[in-house]
């Protein structure tokens, strides 16, 4: 798909770099900071010594590894230390994790580079040059973030290099001890081994290794791996089973109080007045406080007040009893219907930003010679909540010129910044403890709850305060997955070949909102997430155009598991099925024709179809193929329909994610992604009426239950390619696979999410 690239795209890239460069003073003349050694020491205790910025070792041989990413079920507490253990030649059981300090070497470079608007097939100088420059910028920014299915991809080189360097230092120390050449020594199971049978434990060499000069540092080859590529048990499972795992809501600093909030029910509303006299007499109530002015702009948390009490139940009951009057503000008439109408109007009037162009779509749409049929369709997707099992929470203490924060956050860097700002201290005086996350899905990339908690704690006379949102607070004050509207048009010749493919969509921009509220950047320019999965797809057409119109609304939006792929995969894979039907071709055969130049994608599709076999009587198989975060996923959904009820019995999920670091975790993430995507496909919808979110809890924002969960079969294709993301790629293909199966069964094309047959003619 190497069509002509527009000058606008280059302006977008270079303009984006200019904005990013403006954040960094002199990044162009400062050598990039290496990722091996940082400026902040590792938080090691006892007799442990640091061998580099990532790795420390104790006298007993325990290896301490810095953990810069948040564990929210995706398995980083297992997969990332595997990289160090592999290169150090130590058992995984010998590794303990320590929270990475707020240092630039732990910044997520891969996530920022993945945000560039390049097609996977691009191999030109522009892509390589821009990627190189963005890498330099990313190193200087040092944003510590967990998201974008980037943890393994980003850590693959620096954490292996850290382990290999530590091993080389230990070998050098042993060579000095034995007065021999380091080249003749080898390592295994936490020991340096001499050819004559002598061995020294790493722990015994730790102190001397600190000053050792490593010789050649060589990373292992694929065939030398002993841990990587083999199933390893999850390190976090025992603590989750026995109850010792610490999530945000489990933080218990001495003297802790609790806080509950009352937030404006109308988006953008403010507090008019509060009468707290009666509430202050309620059992356990300590204080009623206002946190106005502390929140980032246009975030999930709404304006309001908080009640501080001696238990959460006391705080929540008092918050509900507060007599609060609200100023509804300018969004009191906002509705989902009005937002979709605005999308449609803008699509009618504006061309939007062209993310990809090939050939001449205008000529094809003008009924050029050979056009036998035109297919048009309009698709839509709703706002979605994150609905993580652990409710939004944060614990904070402001005392003696320091701010202590305990948070289940995906953005430690942003959390430190906002805690310092709201707490009135420097970032050096913020102590952040990142706990496990009971689900994140992108919601905890935002730090509105940290700002809120610190603002409340600042008024708690030095006591730590744990702020907890109820499920209703969470559902009605999320940063939602954007709603979207997409229009498709395609032309076919008499043989069913696609001559032209046009897609124009409309939605809000997550990036505009997110970077405004977290970095203060003014909104502007295109946003790759609005068109990802469309402009960079692997289907080839001689004439093609992918455009997007950004249409802002007052609804706060944020990153949601798989981001733009979550709806663009539904739009694209459903429309591809429509084209197969219009061409009179089998949907799988049609895709195979389109993937002739992409053997990896074709192999994934074939693997899923082969594993799925033939659908039983009364059921149908729907197919979808989508690439996101570097990973190719094909899914076959086995579906039945009874009346208007859609039932998904089985999903086969074939995956090419590059080298499979831990196949167990990959299979787990595939299963998780399928269930998460199925919840959105069948049930997920947040609607706005009179400026308020209408849904409040699982009774009206349901998720897939155990009796509704399909059997998930995962096929992991072998690969020696660089590891790619796995936390999100299994989510996007679910909805189109199910919708395509429903069409086979009923002849009804479902073009709106959530999927429903009610009222469909």
Indicate where each model-derived feature is located.
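Cofactor-binding beta-sheet edge motifs in enzyme active sites
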Residues: 2-761
């Amino acid at each position: 798909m190497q069509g002509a690239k527009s000058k606008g795209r280059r302006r977008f890239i270079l303009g984006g770099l200019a904005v990013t460069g403006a954040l960094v003073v002199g990044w162009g003349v400062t050598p990039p900071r290496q990722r091996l050694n940082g400026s902040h020491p590792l938080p090691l205790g006892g007799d442990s010594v640091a061998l580099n910025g990532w790795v420390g070792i104790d006298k007993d041989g325990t290896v301490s590894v810095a953990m810069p990413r948040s564990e929210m079920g995706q398995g980083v507490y297992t997969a990332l230390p595997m990289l160090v253990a592999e290169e150090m030649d130590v058992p995984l059981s010998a590794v303990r994790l320590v929270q990475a300090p707020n240092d630039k070497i732990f910044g997520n470079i891969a996530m920022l580079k993945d945000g560039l608007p390049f097609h996977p097939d691009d191999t030109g100088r522009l892509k390589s040059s821009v990627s190189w420059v963005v890498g330099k910028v990313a190193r200087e920014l040092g944003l510590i973030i967990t998201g974008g299915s980037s943890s393994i991809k980003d850590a693959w080189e620096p954490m292996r290099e850290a382990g290999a360097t530590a091993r080389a230092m230990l070998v050098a120390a042993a060579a000095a001890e034995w007065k021999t050449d380091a080249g003749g020594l080898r390592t295994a199971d936490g020991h340096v081994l001499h050819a004559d049978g002598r061995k020294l434990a790493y722990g015994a060499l730790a102190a001397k290794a600190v000053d050792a000069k490593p010789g050649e540092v060589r990373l292992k080859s694929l065939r030398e791996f002993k841990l990587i590529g083999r199933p390893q048990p999850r390190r976090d499972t025992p603590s989750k089973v026995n109850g010792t795992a610490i999530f945000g809501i489990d933080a218990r600093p001495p003297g802790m109080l609790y806080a509950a909030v009352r937030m404006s029910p109308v988006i953008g509303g403010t507090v008019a007045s509060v009468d707290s006299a009666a509430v202050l007499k309620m059992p356990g109530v300590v204080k009623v406080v206002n946190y106005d002015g502390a929140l980032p702009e246009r975030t999930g948390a709404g304006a309001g007040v908080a009640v501080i009490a001696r238990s959460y139940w006391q705080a929540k009951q008092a918050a509900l009893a507060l007599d609060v009057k609200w100023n509804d503000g300018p969004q009191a008439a906002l509705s989902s219907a009005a937002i979709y109408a605005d999308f449609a109007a803008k699509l009618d009037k504006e061309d939007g930003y062209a993310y990809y162009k090939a050939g001449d779509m205008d000529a094809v749409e003008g009924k050029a010679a050979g056009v036998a049929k035109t297919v048009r369709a309009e698709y839509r997707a709703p706002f979605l909540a994150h609905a993580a099992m652990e409710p939004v929470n944060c614990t904070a203490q402001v005392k003696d010129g320091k701010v202590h924060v305990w948070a289940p956050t995906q953005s430690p860097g942003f959390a430190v910044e906002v805690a310092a700002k709201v707490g009135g201290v420097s970032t050096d005086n913020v102590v952040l403890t990142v706990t496990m996350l009971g689900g994140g899905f992108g919601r905890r990339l935002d730090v509105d709850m940290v700002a809120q908690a610190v603002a409340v704690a600042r008024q708690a006379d030095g006591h730590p305060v744990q702020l907890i949102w109820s499920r209703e607070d969470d559902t009605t004050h999320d940063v939602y997955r954007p709603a979207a509207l997409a229009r498709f048009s395609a032309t076919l010749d008499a043989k069913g070949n696609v001559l032209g493919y046009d897609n124009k969509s409309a939605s809000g921009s997550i990036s505009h909102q997110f970077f405004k509220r977290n970095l203060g950047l003014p909104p502007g320019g295109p946003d790759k997430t609005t068109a990802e999965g469309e402009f960079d797809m692997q289907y080839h057409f001689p004439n093609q155009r992918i455009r997007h119109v950004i249409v802002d609304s007052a609804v706060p939006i944020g990153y949601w598991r798989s981001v733009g792929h979550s709806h663009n995969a539904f739009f694209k894979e459903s429309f591809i099925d429509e084209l197969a039907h219009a061409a009179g071709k089998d949907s799988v055969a049609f895709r195979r024709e389109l993937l002739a130049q992409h053997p990896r994608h074709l192999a994934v599709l074939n693997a899923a179809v082969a594993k799925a076999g033939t659908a039983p009587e009364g059921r149908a198989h729907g197919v979808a193929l989508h690439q996101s975060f570097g990973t190719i996923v094909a899914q076959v959904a086995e579906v039945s329909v009874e009346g208007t009820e859609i039932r998904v019995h089985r999903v086969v999920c074939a995956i090419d994610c590059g080298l499979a670091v831990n196949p167990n975790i990959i299979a787990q993430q595939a299963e998780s992604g399928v269930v998460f995507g199925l919840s959105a496909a069948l049930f997920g919808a947040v609607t706005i009426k009179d400026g308020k979110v209408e849904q409040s809890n699982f009774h009206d924002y349901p998720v897939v239950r155990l009796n509704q969960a399909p059997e998930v079969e995962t096929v992991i294709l072998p690969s020696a390619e660089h590891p790619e993301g796995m936390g999100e790629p299994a989510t996007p293909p679910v909805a189109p696979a199910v919708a395509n199966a429903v069409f086979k069964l009923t002849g009804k094309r479902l073009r709106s999410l959530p999927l429903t047959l009610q009222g469909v003619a």
